[in-house]
Amino acid sequence: MSSTLPALLCVGLCLSQRISAQQQTLPKPFIWAEPHFMVPKEKQVTICCQGNYGAVEYQLHFEGSLFAVDRPKPPERINKVQFYIPDMNSRMAGQYSCIYRVGELWSEPSNLLDLVVTEMYDTPTLSVHPGPEVISGEKVTFYCRLDTATSMFLLLKEGRSSHVQRGYGKVQAEFPLGPVTTAHRGTYRCFGSYNNHAWSFPSEPVKLLVTGDIENTSLAPEDPTFPADTWGTYLLTTETGLQKDHALWDHTAQNLLRMGLAFLVLVALVWFLVEDWLSRKRTRERASRASTWEGRRRLNTQTL
């Protein structure tokens, strides 16, 4: 037992140091664009990065490389910085992330922000077949056409969250939808694009009307459902509440896990220390009894 204890103490110390090092990582900041992540060409956009109070430095990264630095003053009263792009263009479109520093500690990187420049090409036309007014259960198809040759088309439904369906074709793409429900009602637009971050002018809006409620509208999906391989979900970057809640919950869960692991390590160390102390005590007691017995045996021998 005595030889095992130092090894256990070493393992416990290493685990404790690792846990302590993990707890030294600051939670990731929140990043969003104002007024929107889709920015018309030559318009201004502001990228916001929110961390903790006391942060002395914020860094904005573009496509994995350092793009800008901001050092708020006084840091103890500011937990958000803004990075301005006064003239949006295709070179500024792409993926952004940010980090911040408190003292010597750096945070984890934020989620990626996809910044899109629009109005780069001609305006596409959007139509729907069999028409803008359909009955619940029917299937409809949107057609997005752009005479200027492109490689990708995108269909969006206006609303709280912007869902983007991608289609491909030289001058036109088809977007099948359905069977539709009343949840599919709304206003749609489409864009043409040569890549994920440079889009055309938006098409004129097409409003889809779906008549005839399903039996229980409370069970209808809040947003349209499309084939999983064609859909990407873009949450409006001005609505960051859900992202913040998820990030805070993730960080809290990590802290609870680390604290639980540290507690288990501490309990194990205490148990091994108590066991070692009891083992030593039993050894001393056995030695004491053996010594007493040997003394009595010698005394009896001398008496005889």
From Swiss-Prot:
It comes from the Eukaryota. It is a single-pass type I membrane protein. N-glycosylated. Residues 280-304 are cytoplasmic. Disulfide bonds join C49-C98, C144-C190. The keyword Iron does not apply. GO terms for cellular component: plasma membrane; SWI/SNF complex. It is found in: Cell membrane. InterPro entries: Ig-like_dom_sf (IPR036179), Ig-like_fold (IPR013783), Ig-like_Receptors_ImmuneReg (IPR050412), Ig_sub (IPR003599). The chain crosses the membrane at residues 259-279. Residues 1-21 form the signal peptide. SUPFAM superfamilies: Immunoglobulin. Residues 22-258 are extracellular. GO terms for biological process: cellular defense response; immune response-regulating signaling pathway; natural killer cell activation; regulation of natural killer cell mediated cytotoxicity; signal transduction. Selectively expressed by both resting and activated NK cells. Interacts with CD247 and FCER1G. PANTHER family: MHC CLASS I NK CELL RECEPTOR, NATURAL CYTOTOXICITY TRIGGERING RECEPTOR 1. Cytotoxicity-activating receptor that may contribute to the increased efficiency of activated natural killer (NK) cells to mediate tumor cell lysis. This is Natural cytotoxicity triggering receptor 1. It comes from Homo sapiens. The gene is NCR1.
